[in-house]
Amino acid sequence: DLVGNTVKALNGQYRFQTMGEYRALLSLYNMTVEEARGNVRGREYHGLVYSVTDDKGNKVGNPFKSSLFGKSAGYEAVQKKFVRSKSEIKDRKLADMTKRTVLSVLQGTYDKDKFVSQLKEKGIDTVLRYTEEGRIYGATFIDHRTGCVLNGSRMGKELSANALQEHFTLPYAGQPPIPLSIPVDAADKAHGQTAYDSEDISGGMGLR
């Protein structure tokens, strides 16, 4: 079964520490997962239910109980996976490489689509979640180089959903960078006080 094989393969290859990070990983492969809780004959149980999704994340077809895919896809195994992933990521400092790459790309552009595509070229997929008003409320990075799924806020507040939302909606977001020959005060007038200091204007951030 394609869904089961994909779920098992992803569980073996990637590290994730929360259900949200697990869901972000699955979304790259048009799948999602939800927790199922209930009571059978007086005993409480926790389970996971997997679904196939369309490109907009809407569930299609019937859901699959995790028991169809074997123990590794079940609730208890995934909870253990969270704990194991946390210690591996911490002990081996696996988030550092991802953070460096994401920050370097972020500092190079205010264009969200360019940010996502440049990260993809470097081996990192970005999953952004939006409110109905179109604001970013969640950002997760899947680093295929290290096999880690990381919420932006886990790597620092400068990569949190709020910080990214602000970065991509600055007055000059989506605009070509200021020509480097413009003196600082002219640049300030052009944009209302920008957040640049003189070093940045002279090309310190290497914007393109």
Tell what function each PLM region has.
Residues 1-208:
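Extended intrinsically disordered terminal tails
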